[in-house]
């Protein structure tokens, strides 16, 4: 964002600021959480050590290319919360320094064009502050000003290139009603009223929807002075798309005249059964909107080229299939019109993610999971693709967030992690791919931990294919001794066991407790081409289960492997429940977190119906006609989608799928099992875990149920996370050691 702040923009607003608050931030605020000074005993990683790591995120390069602004969250177990503050580091990795020490989290921090001030979100509003001592050892924010006054709150924001306008995300009421909507005096009544699907999503009842607004700085950032991008629509859509999308779904054109955005313009049943989001071009002057005509599935993350003559975005071809191949699409943009739409990754085997234009507007950097690790790639506008980072480096790279040029030399700035260390910033040579870590946020903790060892093993499947299986060995591993082991059952089901770092399913932590951790990339994983990924749809109980058993039996044949557990979450929980009925004494205990137990009930109680509809029916029986609407109650079509994966479908794959639900095999359960679930899990509702536990009890199987009433599909509160880990390892140790 190079350029001058124009009159009437952000600079002018500082003269007539909405609200001027504290003048400086060089002191520590009440509620501040700083870096942990934990001391590790005997080099053994513990759950407490895992929660002590600082979590680095959202790096932003300054306009002059010299300084990176980023955030780090620290956790207080005692306070049961985390707090995110801002940091700086020179782009070459020198002089890391802390910028804020606030007691309230700061998010969405962005450089202003002058390179001397930043804007950010805190307490649901946008703030601006100058950076004092930018290049010094103790920088701070001074002259803080609240520059928005949106009573509904602000989630994220994005400046226009000249900073005269801002996009921001706030909320509007939805079609899900509460008693107060009909009678304000019923302020103590609690109920939700819905007359269509999508009344709840992920972890919340959908009583409000995100909308994106445009505000002119000269008029003040208030709801009254803002334009809702979706104001002209006849129905209540969401922008950005729930539950995880943000302003990466919207992008300003370089001249500020247009906004490209991604939106699923569907509601209710149509929304629940479709993944069809489209890319729209919004004219900020006229309010008119045009769509890039793609159809099909997800179209997301539009990004203008620096010269404004092209747009790229990510795209899936098929509606209703959330694990379709992710293509990197491009289109020319001339005189307000889109033309020459093309797939830059037509000959690329893997899923593209995180595109970033080179400043020459001729090439795009992106990342992709490829053969078990996530690397950085480069595509030119003609679709020629090269790999930047080496597949021999066992790390997962996020997509670059900035490109630095020095003559013919190109340096990419990105972040990376592995199963051995959490996210850190890294610089990548654009030609050689050589990488150099430029932050060391958690070195003081990692240096205290005893090292593990890792193996990439190719396991033969029952049909003779090679399956990448990561194996992590405990510190001081001795092949003459016998160790307990854990088989990891991946969620998704379409995902990948790559070199990622997790704060719950942390394999280094598991290995540190003395376990050999076995991680098969079974059928359905996404880093090995679309055929390997798509095989699992309609075959949950089939080849991928045999893949798990093949990996388990190969490892158990090793003299150093003793007892073995199978553990997994979400679809991994389904796998655990299914294996419990077919494993023939391969495993000594099971742990299922947020798993699917009964497929028929799952179809009727989850929220994103497209997932079950596709995967339960398989690809061959899937059918969709754009605009098709079935009559209510015909049991076959809703919202334009044929119910090919429903329990009442008459296709062969759906019938087989439901016949092989884990709940059908409970009479064969004979192995101790721990069932864990969150009470606010609306993806796989908590009664699935309760039913599995109840059935285990009725079968006389040693079993335990742990229910977190305030957690969703993930366990996020620090004390709950600590308890989760303690119970997890207590169960493993009880039955495997």
Task: Annotate each language-model stretch with its function.
Residues 519-737:
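Active-site-proximal cap/loop segments of hydrolase catalytic domains
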Residues 29-33, 83-84, 171-235, 262-265, ...:
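Predominantly five- to eight-bladed beta-propeller fold
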Residues 123-211:
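Asp-box/WD-like beta-propeller blade repeats and closely related beta-sheet repeat scaffolds
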Residues 48-84:
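Beta-strand-rich domains and repeat architectures in extracellular enzymes and scaffolds
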Residues 74-78, 173-176, 266-268, 317-321, ...:
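Short glycine/acidic-enriched loop and turn motifs that connect beta-strands
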Residues 441-563, 569-570, 604:
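Cap/lid segment of the alpha/beta-hydrolase catalytic domain
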Residues 53-68, 103-119, 151-166, 199-212, ...:
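Conserved beta-propeller blade repeats
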Residues 90-94, 130-134, 217-221, 283-287, ...:
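Short loop/turn segments that connect beta-strands within beta-propeller blades
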């Amino acid at each position: 964002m190079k350029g001058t702040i124009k009159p009437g923009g952000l600079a002018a607003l500082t003269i007539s600021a909405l609200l001027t608050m504290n003048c400086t931030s060089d002191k520590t605020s009440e509620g501040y959480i700083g870096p942990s000074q934990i001391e590790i005993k005997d080099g053994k990683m513990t759950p407490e050590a895992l929660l002590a790591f600082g979590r680095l995120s959202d790096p932003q390069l300054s306009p002059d290319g010299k300084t990176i602004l980023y955030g780090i969250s620290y956790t207080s177990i005692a306070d049961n919360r985390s707090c995110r503050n801002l940091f700086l580091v020179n782009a070459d990795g020198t002089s890391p320094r802390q910028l804020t020490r606030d007691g309230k989290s700061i998010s969405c921090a962005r450089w202003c064009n002058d390179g001397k001030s930043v804007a950010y979100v805190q307490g649901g509003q946008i703030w601006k502050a100058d950076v004092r001592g930018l290049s010094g050892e103790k920088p701070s924010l001074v002259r803080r000003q609240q520059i928005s006054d949106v009573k509904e709150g602000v989630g994220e924001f994005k400046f226009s290139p000249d900073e005269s306008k801002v996009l921001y995300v706030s909320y509007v009421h939805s079609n899900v009603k509460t008693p107060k909507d009909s009678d304000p005096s019923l302020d103590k009544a609690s109920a939700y009223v819905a007359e269509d699907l999508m009344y709840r999503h992920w972890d919340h009842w959908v009583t409000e929807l995100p909308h994106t607004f445009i505000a002119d700085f000269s008029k003040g950032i208030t709801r009254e002075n803002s334009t809702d991008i979706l104001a002209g629509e006849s129905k209540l859509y969401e922008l950005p798309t729930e539950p995880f999308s943000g302003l990466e779904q919207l992008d300003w054109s370089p001249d500020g005249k247009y906004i490209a955005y991604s939106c699923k313009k569907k509601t209710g049943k149509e929304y629940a059964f479709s993944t069809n989001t489209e890319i729209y071009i919004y004219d900020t002057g006229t309010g008119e909107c045009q769509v890039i005509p793609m159809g099909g599935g997800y179209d997301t993350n539009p990004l203008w080229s620096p010269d404004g003559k092209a747009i790229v975005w990510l795209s899936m071809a098929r509606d209703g299939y959330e694990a379709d191949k992710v293509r990197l699409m491009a289109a020319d943009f001339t005189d307000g019109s889109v033309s020459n739409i093309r797939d830059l990754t037509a000959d690329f085997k893997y899923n593209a993610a995180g595109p970033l234009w080179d400043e020459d507007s001729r090439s795009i950097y992106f990342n992709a999971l490829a053969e078990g690790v996530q690397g950085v790639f480069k595509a030119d506008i003609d679709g020629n693709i090269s790999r930047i980072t080496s597949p021999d480096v066992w790390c997962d790279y996020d997509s670059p967030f900035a490109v630095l040029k020095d003559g013919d030399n190109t340096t990419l700035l990105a972040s990376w992690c592995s199963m051995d260390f959490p996210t850190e910033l890294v610089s990548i040579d654009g030609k050689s791919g050589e990488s150099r870590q430029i932050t060391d946020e958690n070195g003081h903790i990692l240096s205290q931990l005893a090292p593990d060892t890792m193996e990439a093993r190719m396991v033969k499947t029952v049909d003779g294919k090679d399956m990448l299986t990561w194996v992590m060995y405990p510190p001081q591993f001795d092949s003459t001794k016998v160790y307990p082991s854990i088989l990891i059952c991946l969620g998704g089901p379409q995902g990948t066991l790559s070199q990622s770092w997790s704060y719950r399913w942390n394999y280094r932590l598991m290995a540190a407790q003395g376990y050999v951790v076995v991680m098969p990339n079974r059928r359905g994983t996404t880093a090995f081409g679309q055929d390997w990924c798509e095989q699992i749809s309609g075959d949950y109980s089939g080849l991928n289960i045999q893949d798990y058993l093949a990996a388990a039996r190969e490892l158990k044949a090793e003299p150093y492997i003793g007892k073995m557990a199978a553990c997994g979450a979400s679809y991994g929980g389904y796998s655990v429940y299914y294996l419990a009925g077919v494993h023939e004494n391969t495993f000594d205990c099971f742990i299922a977190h947020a798993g699917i137990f009964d497929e028929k009930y799952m179809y009727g109680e989850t929220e994103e119906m497209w997932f079950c509809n596709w995967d339960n029916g398989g690809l061959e029986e899937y059918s969709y006609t754009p605009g098709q609407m079935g009559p209510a109650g015909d049991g076959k079509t809703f919202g334009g989608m044929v119910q090919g994966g429903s329990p009442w479908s008459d296709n062969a794959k759906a019938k087989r799928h439901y016949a092989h639900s884990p709940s059908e095999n409970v009479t064969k359960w004979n192995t101790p099992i721990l069932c864990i679930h969150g009470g606010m899990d609306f993806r796989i509702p908590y009664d699935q875990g309760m039913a599995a536990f109840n059935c285990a009890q009725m079968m006389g199987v040693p079993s335990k149920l742990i229910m977190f009433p305030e957690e969703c599909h993930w366990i996020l509160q620090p004390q709950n996370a600590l308890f989760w880990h303690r119970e997890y390892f207590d169960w493993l140790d009880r039955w495997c050691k």
